[in-house]
Each structure stands twice: as C-alpha cells, then as structure tokens.
Amino acid sequence: MVRIRLARGGAKKRPFYQIIVTDNHQARDGRFIERVGFFNPLATGQAVDLRLNMDRILYWINHGAKMSERLYALIKSAKNKSQYSSAG
C-alpha cells in the first residue's frame, strides 16, 4: 500500500520533515516515490514552516494512497490558515 507520510531529517534536536509518498514497507527515512512538500516545526520569523504540493497529494490520494494521522492534521490546520501552495 502506498502511504503519504513524514520522513525526518535535520540535525540532532533540530527536526525537519520531508512529506513523501512511499511504499508502506519502506523505512521511515528510506526510499520514496515522490517528495510532495516539507514541514519545519522550528521555523521562526519569515521562514516557511509548511509547503505542500496539493495537486500531487490529491493525485496520490485518488490513486489509493493513505495519509498518516500527523500529515492529515497538518493539512487540516494549513487549510484553516491557507498556508499551503498548490504549485509546489
């Protein structure tokens, strides 16, 4: 099954997450099919904390991909704030 989920990057105690489309059996930070955005929980000032390519996310959902619970919550909050970009 294909999943849309977060892959952790960044340094120790400074997380940075890539939003990726991957096979269910791959490791959290392992091989992925496509990168569809990022999430920076420590963004301050004018730094972008969330960028989503909603066109590609909707494409994968329509083709049977399932989102993680955390990603679902991020997208829901982004829609409320109108922060996401549909272009990428």
Curated annotation (Swiss-Prot):
GO BP field: translation
UniProt keyword Cell cycle, yes or no: no
Membrane spanning residue stretches: none
Any one cellular-component term (Gene Ontology): small ribosomal subunit
A single GO molecular function term of this UniProt record: structural constituent of ribosome
Gene3D superfamilies: 3.30.1320.10
Pfam family of the protein (one): Ribosomal_S16
UniProt cross-references to InterPro entries, sorted A to Z: Ribosomal_bS16 (IPR000307), Ribosomal_bS16_CS (IPR020592), Ribosomal_bS16_dom_sf (IPR023803)
Keywords for this protein: Ribonucleoprotein, Ribosomal protein
Family: Belongs to the bacterial ribosomal protein bS16 family.
HAMAP family named in the record: Ribosomal_bS16
Protein's UniProt name: Small ribosomal subunit protein bS16
